[in-house]
Structure formats: structure tokens, C-alpha cells
Amino acid sequence: MPYGKIVIILLVISIAFGFLFDWGCNLIDKKTHPLRYTEFIEKYSEKYKVPKALVYAVIKTESDFESNAVSPVGAIGLMQLMPSTFEDITKNFLSENLETGMLYDPETNIKYGVFYLSWLKTFYDDWNCVLAAYNGGLGNVNNWLKDEEYSEDGKTLIIDKIPFKETRNYVKKVNKAEEKYEKLYFTED
């Protein structure tokens, strides 16, 4: 067989293998980063102006889409809301009176979790600050922003310098998941 034909055959095989590998990786990524509760996520991300990919990433990171998840500190549901945060949101911001057991309901949990992200965004220009506050608390983020060790401009955090390891890792993990969701579902090829 002539050398040129061998090169062409190897090139075609390499290209086919590349496409199959990429297809397989995307298939695995879609299994590990699913689109669940789409109706609720689209509804509340639009209503409260929070990027859909970010909401999916928070749910993936917080509960891996397990609506009955409960953390060791008592956070409940898909977006792992603390009962006290839920009560504060429902009574003081949305003038509703709901039982904390409603946090197990996917739509309820997504609605109030997305509202909470949106509310935190009113304090910060940066989604990383929002995520840090969602995980580590508003007061802590405000203190970090005032400290040059953690913020160079008083508006954004230096992620690798967030003093709480859990919060630092949380922000990184959500960002990674958000990038994956953007790539898989929300960007045009």
C-alpha cells in the first residue's frame, strides 16, 4: 500500500477517534451534570435575574440534585437553604408564611434559593462574592472585602485567599460546575 494512502487512513482514523472521544466525554459530562428541574430553574432564574448555569451549578454543588438532602448543619433541599434563612426570606422579604418542611419541595427550594442568590447580588457586583456569601455568610464577605489581604479593590475577592477553606473550595467548585453547564448546554458551538 502506498505511503500516502496509509497517512490518509491514519488521519481519518485519528479524526474519527477524536470525534468519538469528544462525544463520549460530553455524554459522561451530561450524565454527571444533568438538567433537572428545568421548568423551575428557568422560571426563577428569569424572574430573579440569576444565570441558569449558575443555578444548576449551585444545585449540583450543594445537593447533587437530591431534593431530600440535609447537611450536617441542617441545610435542607436542592439548594441547601438553612431553615432560618428560609424563614427570613419568606416572612421579611416575600411576606409569606411557609413551614420549613416546604424546603424539601423542589420548586419551593429553587424559588427561595434563587431569590436568595438574587438578593445577595444586590450587595455585590461580583458573582464570586455572592457565592462566598451564600456559603460563608454576608458579614464575613463584607469583612473580607475591607481587608487588602482578601480583596485588592474592595469589590471582588481573591478566591485563593478566601480565609474559610470550605468557602474558598465552594466558590471554586461552583465556578467549575458553572463552566461545565455553560459549555454543555448554554453556548453555541
Question: What does each model-found stretch correspond to?
Answer:
Residues 1-2:
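N-terminal Lys/Arg-rich, disordered targeting/topogenic segments
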Residues 5-23:
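Hydrophobic membrane-insertion alpha-helices, especially the h-region
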Residues 20-189:
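Catalytic glycan-binding domains that act on GlcNAc-containing polysaccharides
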